[in-house]
Amino acid sequence: MSKLNKTILADFEAAQIQRKLPEFNQGDTVVVNVKVKEGNRERVQAYEGVVIGTKNAGLNSSFTVRKISHGFGVERVFQTHSAIIDSVEVKRRGKVRAGKLYYLRGLEGKAARIKEDLAAAAQAKAARQAAAKAE
């Protein structure tokens, strides 16, 4: 690929990456609000679960969220820059050491819990208070 084509492709990707999502990592519990089209109307559906993996590849970035629904594990892969994602909210910061949490697939009940990262939660709380004070 020539240098000109690479710069054109990079400019196109930069234009497509427009929306900023909150920072989240593996182990964090997130709520992903997804736009669902049913017939001629559109609604927003919440999908809450634990982020078990992320793939950072520019415009092709994605993340995988796992939740337990009616006793069964359900995983969904979301494209980070997709138009169907309305918003992402981080509910809880998890403290994990692994990059991919695929081992959670084999665990059930209390064994599948993830410890909360209290230091990150305290920093987020301080940031919210500082923002409220500035207003």
Swiss-Prot record:
Tell me a GO cellular component: cytosolic large ribosomal subunit
Enumerate the InterPro entries for this protein: Ribosomal_bL19 (IPR001857), Ribosomal_bL19_CS (IPR018257), Ribosomal_bL19_sf (IPR038657), Translation_prot_SH3-like_sf (IPR008991)
Family matches, as Pfam families: Ribosomal_L19
Q: What's an example Gene Ontology biological process for this entry?
A: translation
Q: Mind listing the GO molecular function terms for this protein?
A: structural constituent of ribosome
The set of disulfide-linked cysteines is none
Xref: HAMAP family: Ribosomal_bL19 (MF_00402)
PANTHER family in alphabetical order: LARGE RIBOSOMAL SUBUNIT PROTEIN BL19M, RIBOSOMAL PROTEIN L19
For this protein, the record's NCBIfam families field holds:
rplS_bact (TIGR01024)
Similarity comment text for this entry: Belongs to the bacterial ribosomal protein bL19 family.
- What is the protein name for this chain? Large ribosomal subunit protein bL19
Q: Which gene encodes it?
A: rplS
